[in-house]
Amino acid sequence: MITDTRPETRPSAGDQSSAIVVARLDAAQLAALPAAQWDLLTRNSLTENPFFDRRQVLASLATVDKGKKVGALSFSVGGALVGLFLFQSRSKIPAPFPVANGLANDYLLNGTPLIDRDHADAVIEKFLDLVRTGGAPAIWAFDDVDLDAAVFQKLRAAVAATGMAWATATPYQRAYLTRLDGGLEEHLTQVLSKNRLKDVRRTMRRLGEAGHIALEHVEDEARLPGRIDDFLTLENAGWKGEMGTSFLSRPADAEFARCSYVAGLAAMDSLLLDGRPIAMKLSIRTQRTAFTPKIAYDETYKKLGPGMALEYMLIEDFYANDTIDAVDAAATAEGHSALNFFNNHKSMATVILGCRSWQVRLLAWLHDGRETLKKKVLEFRARQAERRHAAPKPDVET
C-alpha cells in the first residue's frame, strides 16, 4: 500500500520512466489511502471525475455501499499516487465470468478511473499489462463514461496496439454546456427555439409578478450544510418522495448526501422567491467542469416553471462569470431537461475491455440486452398508465 503522507508530493512528467508500484486494495485499504494524495490526484487527473473524489467514495462506502465488496488498483511513482482504478464485482448485468465493474451506484455516475495527466501513458501501459498477465481482472466494464475523454482515447489506442478486445454498449447522449463565442445572446438565439425562449421569458415575468426572485450560489462551509438540508426537504416533498426515490426515503442515502456534498466539492444554486428556495440544483466539481447530478423544485409552484427559470438563470450566470469552463448534466439517460438549454453533448457509453474477445462481445451484448428490456418495460408501464387514465370511470350512485 501507499503510505507516503506528504501533502503535495506529485512526481514531475520527467518521472514517467520511474518504476510504477501497483497495489491491489480492499475497501479498508482504499479508505486508508493518504487523503492529500488522493485529493491531489483528483485535481490533476487527465479526465475529471468528481464522482471518484475521496469524499464521494468514502461517504458511499460508509453508507449506501456499506458492506459491498469493493476493490481498487493504485499506481504510484516515487511514493506519490498517480492512478486509481475503483471497481466492484457486483453488477446489474449477470455474466458467466468474473468482471471488474467500475464502482457505481445511484449517486456515483461516472466510471472513469483517476489517472495523473503527466503519467497517463505509463499508468495505462502498466494497467493493460496487468490485465494481460493475470495481475488484474481479465475483463473490465466502465459505466457512464465519455467516449471522447482523453483517458478513453488513450486506453482505446493502447488496447488496439496490444491486440486486446474493446467494445462499447448502451450508448446515449449527455447534455453538456460550453460557451459560445457570441456570448449569451448568441446562446439564446442559437440553442433555444423561439417557442422555448418565449416560454422562458413568460416564466420569468410570472415569477417576478409573484414576488422578488434571485439566484443564490452557496459553496462555503458555513451555509452549504443548511442548503443541502433544504434540498433534501424540497426533493422529498415532491414526486421523488412519493415514489420512494428521494434521498430522505432511505436513511443511508440521506447520510450519504450530508457526508459527501461538502464544501470544497459541492455547491448549491437556488432560485429564491422572496428569500425562499423554490428550485435548487446541486453541482460537484474538482477541476473546471461542474457536474450537476441533482435538481429539485417546489411543486406548489409548478405552474410558474421554477425549474425552467433556474436553468435559464444559471445560463445567464455561466456567461457572466468565468469560474468554470463547462457544465455536465450528469444524467445517465437521454431526455434530461438541460438538453433544452445546453449547446453541446457528450457521447456516453459503457466501455468494456479484456483479453478474450468473446467475453468482451458477450458482455456488451448483455449490457445492450438489459437496456433494451428496460426500455420495453418502461414503455409497457407508460401504456398501462395511459389506458388507466383513459378508461371511462364507472358511474357512482349517490
Named regions from a protein language model:
Residues R54, A104-N105, L114-H119, T170-Y176, ...:
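Short C-terminal domain-edge/linker segments immediately following a structured domain
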Residues L128-L130, Q190-L197, W365-L373:
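Short intrinsically disordered coil segments
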Residues K69-G71, V77, R90-P171, R285-L353:
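Acyl-donor binding region in acyl/amide transferases
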Residues V21-G102, D144-R174, D181-K303, V396-E397:
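A conserved beta-strand-loop-helix scaffold within acyl/acetyltransferase catalytic domains
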Residues I2-L25, S89, F152-E185, D322-T398:
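Active-site/acyl-donor-binding loops of N-acyltransferases
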